[in-house]
């Protein structure tokens, strides 16, 4: 099985399954000298971990990360960093009834067709449980970018089902289980999720993620454009079915005179492009948005087939998130951090001696 590594200079390779003994990853390319401990990575893992509210899966995992290599006396050594999280609360018996059945909307069928065999326990490798290691690896990238470049990466829930959330209060995001930037809307979100749970149904969501303080110049045209690689990384998150950079599909209805990001000596006059032009960062906020589909694991009966091609009915009885978007915010932040870290190292390696005749334009004139 290939396709488990992302990055060129800062690389992340993950391994493990939902109901296996552990999940792990290897982070290679991190520069030496970064102060790093498990505590630095644990904060975001706690933000992502399951079982923290009635609105997410009730699987209880501490998601305690162990650093196995690449750190000595509290500093990164420049060698591969090995990370491990042990699974603690698997309940594989919940999946015995679907051992020979394909859950509609899941990767069961496609994994079976590709490999001729699959780990049916919680989805195996296709489970979002794998994203715990992305968050751990992303924690390294976030720390480096923050301490060396002053880059801050934050995400938030922008929409849950039909409920659109605006405006954004950055100080409120981590004060509720939804990562909702408007505390006044939290009771509405709770009522919506309670009703869904009673129905046995699920909901989709939209998550926005913003990187502030990114220097201009990151991105490698033409195939490794920064926006292309961000879209690639964000689309790799489980359940993501759409990615927008900046105004995204809103550009279809916009006129060029409005959409273009005009400039002045005082700064940019707009950011429709989401901080990226020609595949290269402008120095403005990098803004991305992901759309996550409704969870397919439902208590409601669904039609499907078994491994013999016979018609069957499937009811999922395991512990699942009724909306995967609720816990997706730290995952999206991690994937953006990994891409930005990789592109910073690539840019530094090729262009650190470039003499610029122009100081960067301020991100905003306002």
Swiss-Prot record:
Pathway: Metabolic intermediate biosynthesis; chorismate biosynthesis; chorismate from D-erythrose 4-phosphate and phosphoenolpyruvate: step 7/7. This is Chorismate synthase. It catalyses: 5-O-(1-carboxyvinyl)-3-phosphoshikimate = chorismate + phosphate. It comes from Methylococcus capsulatus (strain ATCC 33009 / NCIMB 11132 / Bath). GO terms for molecular function: chorismate synthase activity; FMN binding. Disulfide bonds: none annotated. Transmembrane segments: none annotated. The keyword Oxidoreductase does not apply. Keywords: Amino-acid biosynthesis, Aromatic amino acid biosynthesis, FAD, Flavoprotein, FMN, Lyase, NADP. The keyword Zinc does not apply. Homotetramer. InterPro entries: Chorismate_synth, Chorismate_synth_AroC_sf, Chorismate_synthase_CS. FMN binds at residues 125-127, 238-239, 278, 293-297, 319. Reduced FMN (FMNH(2)).
């Amino acid at each position: 099985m290939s396709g488990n590594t992302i990055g060129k200079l800062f690389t992340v390779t993950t391994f493990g399954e939902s109901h296996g003994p552990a999940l792990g990853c290897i982070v290679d390319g991190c520069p030496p000298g970064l102060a790093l401990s498990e505590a630095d990575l644990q904060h975001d893992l706690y933000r992502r971990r399951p079982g923290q509210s009635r609105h997410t899966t009730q699987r209880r995992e501490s998601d305690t990360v162990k650093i196995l290599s690449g750190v000595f006396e509290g500093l990164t050594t420049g060698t591969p960093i090995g990370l491990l999280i042990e699974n603690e609360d698997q309940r594989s018996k919940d999946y015995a009834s679907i051992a020979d059945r394909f859950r509609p909307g899941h990767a069961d069928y496609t994994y079976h067709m590709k490999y001729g065999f699959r780990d049916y326990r919680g989805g195996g490798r296709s489970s979002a449980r794998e994203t715990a290691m992305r968050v751990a690896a992303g924690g390294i990238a976030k720390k480096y970018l923050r301490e060396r470049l002053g880059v801050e990466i934050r995400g938030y829930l922008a929409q849950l089902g039909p409920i659109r959330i605006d405006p954004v209060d950055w100080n409120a995001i981590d004060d509720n289980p939804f990562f909702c930037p408007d505390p006044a809307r939290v009771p509405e979100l709770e009522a919506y999720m309670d009703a869904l749970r009673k129905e046995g149904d699920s909901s989709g969501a939209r998550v926005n993620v913003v990187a502030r303080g990114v220097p201009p110049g990151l991105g490698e045209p033409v195939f490794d454009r920064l926006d292309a690689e961000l879209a690639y990384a964000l689309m790799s998150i489980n359940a993501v079915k759409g990615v927008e950079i900046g105004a995204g599909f809103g550009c279809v209805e916009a006129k060029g005179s409005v959409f273009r990001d005009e400039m002045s000596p005082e700064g940019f006059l707009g950011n429709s492009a989401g901080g990226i032009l020609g595949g290269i960062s402008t120095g403005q906020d990098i803004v991305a948005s992901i759309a996550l589909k409704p969870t397919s694991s439902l208590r409601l009966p669904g039609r499907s087939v078994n491994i013999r091609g016979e018609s069957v009915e499937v009811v999922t009885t395991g512990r699942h998130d009724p909306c995967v978007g609720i816990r997706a915010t730290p995952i999206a932040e991690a994937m953006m951090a990994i891409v930005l870290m990789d592109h910073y190292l690539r840019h530094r390696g090729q262009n650190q001696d470039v003499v610029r005749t122009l100081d960067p334009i301020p991100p905003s004139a306002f």
